[in-house]
C-alpha cells in the first residue's frame, strides 16, 4: 500500500546514504523517482527526454511530455499567442516581461505551462473560467476550472480558509512559467536568477 511504499523509499535512501553505492533504480512511479534519485533520466518509447536533478526536471521540464509526466496534478498546458509585448490566453491579455520576450523571440503560437500549486484563485484575474470540480484531500484542495477558451486548468489550494467557490479567476507569476514550442513540445527556455537559458534538456 501507499504507506509501505513510502517506508520502502525512506529505507532505500537511508541505505544509500550509509554505503554510498552507485545505484540505477528503474521505476514507472514518478514519486519514487523524485524522492529517491539524485538525477533522473526520463524516457519515452526508449528515447531520452531529459536527464537532470529532480528539482530541475520539476521546475524546467524539457518538453510537454516531461511536464505532464512529473507532478500530480500534472502541469497545466495552455495554448497561447504572443503579440508584441503581450501573450494571449483565450480572451485574456497578459503583459510579458522583457527577459521572457527575449526567450520567445519571433515565435507567435506557444504552449504556456504552469503548475497547479503556482496558480492562485482571484476574482479580478485576467484569465477567467468556471469551476467544474473541487477535490478535497484534507491538507489541500484541487480546483478544476474550465477557461473561457474551453481549456481546463487545475489549481491547488493549501489555504483551508480560502473561498474556492466564489473565485473563478486565475493568476500566476512569470517566475513559475514554462513555455513550449507548439509543434515540437520542446521547452524554448527559461529564466533563472535574472539570466536567460535556452536549453532545458538537462543540468
Name each model-derived stretch:
Residues 53, 65, 79-81, 128-132:
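Residues located in well-ordered beta-strands
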Residues 7, 60, 68-69, 122, ...:
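Residues that scaffold the ATP/ADP-binding catalytic core of kinase and kinase-like folds
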